[in-house]
């Protein structure tokens, strides 16, 4: 459900909602960053990130020990320096960048299902984390008036 590119997040969310609605089945809204962490087998503190724009990243930190994954931070967007500082504060030992895979997404969805946190298609919402370019430009115009 994101974060990621606006178009990719919209297409992915629409596809999941469509399949869920058509089959009248619950679905799992999975963070791209959590899916990345679930796709890794490394133990320690994981810093998972995706390129957002030049000099910025979407990122989150997770702790994995003995197969258990614990989220340390929520999904964020910020300057690469902010991500690096957060990784250092949490003692990150594993850095995963732009390495999503279907197995990680499936494992994250399976974890949601096992914990009873599936949702219906109307509850799933995209996670953009930042304004679109059109929204940013509109906001700038409104502030100038």
Tell where the protein language model's regions lie, with residue ranges.
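Oxyanion-binding and handling regions
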Residues: 28-145
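DPxDG-like acidic metal-binding loop motif
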Residues: 1-2, 6-27
